[in-house]
């Protein structure tokens, strides 16, 4: 897609910093390595204050440091509850060391099966939310049945 894979996180960080300028200031300008714009007005502003949450995904060694430095949450992939508990402890320590409130950094685990016990274990390990992915269905009626099955397994 034309991106610089080697520097994807550098570009991502810079784009997020540029967006935060646009989201939080009446007039903003940005001068970076990848993105530059003169003093501009950008409206409408996001409803969420100070800006929409920035959720970073992945499992790279430095992702938790990135989350603490310029994110608001983490979206890990292919993680177990035990590994999540370790990562939550690391994330909390890094946040405290950086002067951030650890509870202000969310963790969302995605793509999980409709397993009430597994979801409870993820919450106990420090996840703020667990996203259950329904099976692909061909019709709306089939999807309704699938969502009811998930609700029965997880919520009721």
Q: Positions of the model-derived regions?
A:
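Active-site-adjacent structural elements that line small-molecule/cofactor binding pockets in enzymes
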Residues: 1-156
């Amino acid at each position: 897609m034309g991106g610089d894979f080697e520097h994807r996180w550098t570009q991502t960080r810079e784009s997020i910093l540029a967006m935060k300028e646009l989201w939080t200031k009446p007039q903003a300008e940005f001068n970076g390595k990848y993105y530059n714009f003169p003093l501009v007005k950008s409206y409408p502003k996001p409803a969420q204050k100070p800006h929409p949450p920035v959720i970073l995904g992945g499992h790279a060694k430095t992702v938790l440091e990135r989350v603490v430095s310029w994110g608001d949450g983490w979206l890990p992939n292919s993680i177990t509850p035990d590994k999540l508990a370790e990562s939550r402890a690391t994330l909390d320590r890094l946040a405290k060391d950086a002067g951030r409130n650890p509870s202000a950094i969310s963790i969302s685990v995605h793509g999980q099966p409709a397993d009430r016990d597994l979801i409870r274990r993820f919450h106990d390990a420090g996840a703020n939310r667990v996203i259950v992915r329904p099976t692909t269905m061909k019709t709306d009626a089939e999807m309704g049945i699938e969502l009811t099955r998930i609700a029965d397994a997880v919520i009721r």
